[in-house]
C-alpha cells in the first residue's frame, strides 16, 4: 500500500483511507467518485459496481491531445444512471404501496441546456422521461429534441407566440401541458386554441403558503414569482369553463423551492398542495396529473443533514413521501391516483460534471524569522513578540495566541502613528506568524477549549493558491449564493496534506475566490492541500458542478468558456472522448462586447508605426499582438 513518508500524531502512517476521510469523498461522491490505492481520484460513471476511470490519467491524456486547463469534464453515463435511480425509486414505491398510476421524471432544461445533457437524459432506456421548458428558446429546443409522443410541460411567462408554439407541439404529436402561471395567459390560450382548432391540455400552478427553508425558498411560498392564489385559481377555472375548455384542465403544478434540505419541510408543503388536487376534482375538473415541481436536493457537503448544502434524505425517502402521501389522501377522499411528475433537474445533473483547475502560484505568510542581533534595540512591542517565539506550556497555548494577536494590534497602531519603521513592522509580522504556526501545531481539534483558536489560525495561516480559472465563469453559485462544492486534489492522496489553502481565481476582483470547503464532516474556510513541488502541475477537481453552473457563468474580466469534453465508458470498461469543445479565444470574448479584433489590429498597426522602435521590433510586436488575439483568455497551462 502506498503511504505517506511521515507519520501522523498517533504514530501511524498516512494512507489513502485518511484522505478519503479528510475530503469526505465517500459521503458526497454518491458512489461515483472515490480515491484509489495509488492516491488518485477515480470515477465510476455507471455506479459503484462499474469499472473505475483514473481521472488524473484521463486529464493527462486529454492535455497531451491538445486540450488545456481549466477543463470541464462531463460524464454523460452518470446522467443516465441518475435517471434510472430516480425513476427506480418512484417505481419501487409505487409497487410497494400499490399506487394505481405511474411516474414520469421531467427534466427542466434550464438546469443545463447542453445538447449532450438533454439528449443523454431522454435517451435513457426503459424509463418514463419528459422535458420542461420555461422560455421560448427552451420550448423550441424541446420540441425538436423530445421524441414523438413525449411529455413536454411549459412553465414560465408566456406570450401569444409561446402558446402558439406549444399548441403546435401538441398537434405534432407531443403530450404538451401549458401551465397557467398568470391569469393573463388564459385569454391567449383560449384564442390560440380556437385559431389552431386544438383542445389544449392545461395545467394550473398554485402558489402555496408553505415555505421550505433553503437558499431558494422565495421560489415557493406566497412571495413566489409564479403561481395562482386561491381566488385567482377559481377565476381561471371559471374562464376556461365559460370557453368550454375546462375539461382540458389535466394537471396541478406547484413548486416549493430548489434544494430542500429537510424532508419534513417538503412533507408540510405537500400536505397543502394535495388539498388543491381534491378541490379541483370536486369542481368537476378531470385533473389526473400532479407535477410536484423541484426540491429534490443534492448532498454537496456529504453531511446528510439540514445544512443548505446538504439533504437529510435520499431519493427513495423522497419518492416514498410523494407516493405515500398522495395515496393516503386519495384513498381517504375516494379519488383516483394521479400520474406523478417531478422536476428534479439538480439531482439528475449535478454529479455528471467536474472542473479541473491547476495551481499556478502559491502565496504563503513569511514566518521565517531572521537572526536578531540586538533585541533590546527593538521597540518594546516587537520585543514582546520576539519573546513569544520561545517554548510555550501546553496549558498556555490559547493565552499565548491572544497575547500575540493583541501585540500585533499595537504594532499596526504604532506603525500608523509613525512610531515603527517598515523594517520593524515586517519583523513583527514574521514573529507573529512564526508564533501562530508553532501554536497551530500544538492545538488539538478534539479539545473544545482549542477549537476557536484553531479555527482562527486555520484562516490566518492558510496559503493562497492562485488557480487558473474564473469563479464567475465556472462556479458562479459559489460567489452569488455561497454554494458549497466539494474540492479535492486529483493526485498525491497517498500523502498527507500538510498545508491549508484558500483558492483564488485569475479575475481582478476580490470576490474571485472560494470561501467554503468540505472538510471531513464540516464546512471550513480553507481546505487541506499538499505543498506544491517545484515544476509540478498540482491539479484540483471541483465536483458536482453539472447543475446551473455552466449556463449561469458570466464573462467577468472577459474570461470565457473553458475547454470541455464528454467522457463515455464502454461496456468493457474502456473509455472514449466525444463532444470536445475548445475554449473561447480572446478574440471571441472581445467580439461579445462588440470590440472588433480587426479594428483593434488597425489601431495596433497605427501605434506600432508611430512608435520609436526598429523595423524588426515592429514586426515582432504586431506578430505578438495578432497571436495574442487567438489565445485562450486563461493562462497557458
Curated annotation (Swiss-Prot):
What are its E.C. numbers?
Answer: 4.1.1.19
Q: Can the keyword Lyase be found in this entry's annotation? A: yes
N6-(pyridoxal phosphate)lysine occurs at which residues?
Answer: 110
Tell me where the signal peptide lies.
none
Keyword entries, A-Z: Decarboxylase, Lyase, Magnesium, Metal-binding, Polyamine biosynthesis, Pyridoxal phosphate, Spermidine biosynthesis
Q: Which GO terms describe its molecular function?
A: arginine decarboxylase activity; metal ion binding
Q: Which reaction does it catalyse?
A: L-arginine + H(+) = agmatine + CO2
Residues recorded as binding substrate, renumbered to this chain, are: 290-300
Q: Matching SUPFAM superfamilies, A to Z?
A: Alanine racemase C-terminal domain-like, PLP-binding barrel
Q: Which GO terms describe its biological process?
A: arginine catabolic process; putrescine biosynthetic process from arginine; spermidine biosynthetic process
Q: InterPro entries from the entry?
A: Ala_racemase/Decarboxylase_C, Arg_decarb_HB, Arg_decarbox_C, Arg_decrbxlase, De-COase2_CS, De-COase2_N, Orn/DAP/Arg_de-COase, PLP-binding_barrel
The answer to keyword Iron applying to this record is: no
**CC cofactor:** Mg(2+); pyridoxal 5'-phosphate
Which protein family is it in? Belongs to the Orn/Lys/Arg decarboxylase class-II family. SpeA subfamily.
Described function: Catalyzes the biosynthesis of agmatine from arginine.
Name of the protein in question: Biosynthetic arginine decarboxylase
Q: Which gene encodes it?
A: speA
